[in-house]
Regions:
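Mg2+-dependent phosphoryl-transfer enzymes with acidic/Ser/Thr/Gly-rich catalytic loops
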Residues: 227-228
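Paired acidic/hydrophobic, glycine-rich loop segments that form the ligand-binding mouth/hinge
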Residues: 101, 218-219
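Conserved alpha/beta-domain cores
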Residues: 1-205, 211-213
């Protein structure tokens, strides 16, 4: 994808977000993660050359490692988010390169991240992923366990809970999707503070619903950097 196409898509997303903010009287920023997991290196480089300064989202540990090692040499201040399922044997790559891990879906994984962060002498920012769609194949904590999970993980020395993440059902049913987003927003409202301030919900096809229900971070892939 060329620079002009990327810029046009970015401008369209910003216009949509601003319209939604006006519609719902939202006065806080809504951050965009440019999901690059399906994009070619050429497309990512075109994006970076625009200096738009959005985080890049990767879902596979080796891809994060390889892309970060190559791109960080030539581009300054790239922010990397990890948004995929986490395998304990790949945590070392994720902690080494990710600025924010959005998909922490078990206490065991949080503990692995904490150990690796200690080795790397860093405090790792994370989001807790909740399974708002109740799908077995998706990762995430049960919403009913939010207090126990939050209290246990926040006491780990080298992880920093920045907020929460959820993925909705892929269904043609706005009412169901909105219920899922609102269920996580309710937990976020109870636990948010100056540090725990991110609610990451919504992708290309449903971010308009996520913003309606409190999302302040959205993850856009096919509608932005696309497939290449």
């Amino acid at each position: 994808m060329d620079r002009d196409s990327i810029k046009n898509k970015y401008d369209s997303i910003i216009e949509n977000i601003n319209s939604l903010k006006d519609k719902y009287n939202i006065n806080y920023n809504i951050d965009i993660v440019a999901v690059s997991k399906y994009s070619s290196m050429e497309t990512i480089k075109e994006f970076l050359s625009l200096n738009i300064n959005l985080p890049l989202g990767e879902s596979k540990a080796q891809s994060l490692r390889d892309r970060a090692e190559e791109l960080n040499k030539n581009y300054n201040n790239i922010i990397w988010h990890f948004i995929g399922r986490i395998q304990s044997n790949k945590v070392k790559y994720i902690v080494r390169y990710a600025d924010l891990i959005q998909s922490v879906d078990s206490i065991e994984i949080a503990e692995c991240i904490n150990k690796e962060a200690i080795k790397n002498n860093k405090v790792q920012d994370i989001l807790l992923q909740f399974n708002i769609s109740n799908e077995e194949q998706k990762g995430g904590f049960n919403l009913s366990d939010y207090n126990m999970v939050y209290d246990k993980i926040k006491n780990l020395s080298n992880v920093n809970i920045k907020g929460f993440m959820g993925i909705s059902l892929k269904v043609d049913n706005d009412f169901e999707i909105e219920k899922e987003f609102e269920s996580l927003n309710e937990v976020f409202i109870k636990l948010k503070d100056e540090n725990t301030s991110i609610l990451s919900m919504g992708m290309t096809n449903d971010y308009h619903l996520a913003i309606k229900h409190g999302a302040n971070m959205i993850r856009i892939g096919s509608g932005f950097l696309g497939y290449s």
